[in-house]
């Protein structure tokens, strides 16, 4: 299964990316322990809970924040109306370097959208008994984000019948993607 995910996962993840992200982005970082050392998982989530991107880096500094922000801006092609982060100063320095500091907002409690998006990763990490390398973590988490976005339906916004329709459509998408590979 792992070889299949490593081979076909990036292709499936690329096909499933949403064309347009919401204009409010939440950025956050959390540590992961890989092979006995601490690395940082940087994650960007939009206001609707869709994971925009993940990045696994060895450091938690301005360069890592810059790399994530540049990657997001290049991928989505626009500057968000609002960029919400926690109080890590690296975000402010990176936003200043990119010239988007007027869109940046530090908010301790408004960043819960990004904080909560780490929970599925923590569950997967426990089930997999950790990640073996930084590269394998990056590959898995990128693919997992695409699959999560496909099946994640904001349940509290929908009725049960609509939720079932969304899940059926997501399953059809999954079966089509798996059959194509």
What name fits each language-model region?
Residues 1, 28, 44, 49, ...:
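Mobile genetic element proteins and their domesticated derivatives, centered on retroelements
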Residues 2-23:
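Short, basic alpha-helical nucleic acid-contact segments in DNA-binding proteins
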Residues 3-7, 54-77:
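Active-site beta-loop-alpha junctions of metal-dependent nucleic acid enzymes
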Residues 21-34:
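Two-metal-ion RNase H-like nuclease active-site motif
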Residues 35-51, 61, 69:
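Short conserved beta-strand segments at catalytic cores or DNA/RNA-binding microdomains
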Residues 80-91, 108:
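Acidic/histidine-rich, metal-coordinating catalytic segments
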Residues 107-124, 132, 137:
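RNase H-like two-metal-ion nuclease catalytic core shared by retroviral integrases
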Residues 127, 138-181:
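C-terminal domain-tail junction helix/linker
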């Amino acid at each position: 299964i792992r070889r299949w995910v490593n081979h076909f996962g990036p292709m499936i993840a690329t096909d499933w990316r949403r064309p347009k992200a919401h204009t409010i982005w939440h950025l956050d970082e959390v540590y992961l322990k890989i092979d006995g050392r601490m690395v940082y998982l940087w994650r960007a989530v939009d206001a609707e809970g869709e994971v925009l991107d993940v990045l696994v880096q060895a450091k938690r500094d301005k360069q890592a924040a810059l790399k994530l922000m540049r990657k997001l801006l290049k991928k989505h092609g626009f500057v968000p109306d609002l960029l919400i982060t926690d109080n890590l100063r690296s975000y402010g320095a990176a936003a200043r370097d990119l010239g988007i500091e007027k869109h940046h907002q530090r908010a301790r409690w408004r960043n819960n959208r990004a904080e909560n998006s780490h929970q599925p990763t923590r569950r997967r990490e426990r089930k997999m008994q950790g990640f073996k390398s930084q590269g394998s973590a990056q590959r898995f988490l990128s693919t997992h984000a695409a699959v999560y976005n496909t099946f994640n339906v904001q349940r509290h916004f929908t009725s049960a019948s609509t939720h079932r329709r969304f899940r059926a459509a997501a399953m059809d998408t999954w079966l089509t993607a798996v059959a194509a590979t």
